[in-house]
UniProtKB/Swiss-Prot annotation:
It is found in: Plastid, Chloroplast. GO terms for molecular function: ribosome binding; translation initiation factor activity. It comes from the Eukaryota. Monomer. One of its GO terms (cellular component) is chloroplast. This is Translation initiation factor IF-3, chloroplastic.
């Protein structure tokens, strides 16, 4: 039910005022070829649109006088929806990919994790690298700091880090952002 109300609200934002529902006495008219026709009384603008068998659509009510366009409303509405769909397609959502490891990690395992991070960063994702401690291992935090410095150095060509590292319980993590090219 909640999704339908969201859709309805987004539809209302895209609704345009057309023809007799325009309540301004004087308007600036743009025709279907994007030429400015000038400033008209609303009655004359409606007659002009009716003669061309098109609609009068309020484009901008913030200007003085408000801007209206003489166009086919159905085609205009379709074009607006198509534009919004295209804009939505082009949006890229940044996701956070997490790579977990221990502070004592072998060279090959380390290289595998670095390669994963490189792959994620090239795709434009943020990478969260977590170092996990078990039991009393938390006392070896200096070894973890050295590992984090090594990771930062290994990925310095592709990533920049927000902070040096954050400590959360028995985990230490660092957030890496892809470098802007």
């Amino acid at each position: 039910m909640l999704e339908k109300s969201k859709q309805k609200n987004s539809f209302d934002k895209n609704k345009f005022i057309i023809n007799n529902k325009i309540s301004f006495p004087i308007v600036r008219i743009i025709d279907e070829n994007n030429y400015q026709l000038g400033i008209y009384k609303i009655e004359d603008a409606l007659k002009l649109a009716e003669e061309k068998n098109l609609d009068l659509v309020l484009i901008n009510d913030k200007t003085e006088p408000p801007v209206v366009r003489i166009i086919d409303y159905g085609k205009f509405k379709f074009a607006q929806e198509k534009k919004s769909r295209e804009a939505k397609k082009k949006q890229h959502q940044v996701t956070v990919k997490e790579i977990k490891m221990r502070y004592k990690i072998e060279d090959h395992d380390y290289q595998v994790r670095i390669n994963q991070a490189i792959k994620f960063l090239k795709l434009g994702n943020k990478v969260k690298i977590s170092l996990t401690f078990k039991g009393r291992e938390i006392q070896y935090i200096d070894l973890a700091e050295k590992l984090i410095e090594k990771i930062i150095h290994s990925l310095s060509s592709l990533a920049e880090h927000e902070k040096v590292f954050d400590k959360e319980g028995k985990n230490i993590y660092i957030m890496l952002l892809p470098k802007k090219t």
